[in-house]
Amino acid sequence: LILDYCMRTDRSVDTTMALGTLLFLVGLGFIMYRTGTIQAIESGELMKNFSAVQGEILQRASLTEAEQARLAMTFKTTMNRAMDLLPAFFLLSGLVVVYLSYRISGRNMRIGGEKVICPGPFFLMHLPRVPVLISVGLLGTALAMNYFMALSIEPYILNGLVVVVSLLACQGMSIVNFYLLRFVPSPFLRGLIMFFVLVVPVGQMGLAALGLIDQFIDVRSIEGA
């Protein structure tokens, strides 16, 4: 409903995305509260349940005690990190869901003859410059303050880094997609190249760096590219 209202009242794409994501997070938080998920996370009950299931699986496996202990420690570390990153995961999920819904709804309305504002295709995606640069500056300041003053705000910094780096990587991916569509005619080859870039850790960081560069220089408009 909020997407339909914003499109029909000619709200900007950034405003509509922000409102849609906010409502998504509010709705998700309400569902988690009503189902007791938030309480289970805060009390540690959810981790206990995961650990119990993991323990049963390891006991049924033909592993030595040393291997079971090593896998249990790895699982515990991974789950603790996953719990710390839940806010970033929820925010990114909300942005993806809202973007896809917004894009599909807007395109269908345009096909139906309505003049509405909606996001352009993915290969032309560009994050709003001011919020991105402010976020990068705040994260840099927080990292410096935490390093020199030991503020113990690592979970907040980590969530912020995951969100900002992921968004910049998406922008970098859209730039790569732009040039693949321009120079690589085969859809299969384009998909293969994109898959290779995504599965290589260096490629992911390269996408984020490309997205950050695009905040200062419009990479798609470089002469001769």
Regions found by a protein language model. Name each.
Residues 4-7, 32, 142-147, 195-201:
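Hydrophobic alpha-helical transmembrane segments
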Residues 6, 10, 39, 105-116, ...:
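Membrane-interfacial segments
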Residues 16-28, 123-137, 195-198:
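Transmembrane alpha-helical segments of multi-pass membrane proteins
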Residues 112-167, 171:
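Small-residue-rich helix-loop
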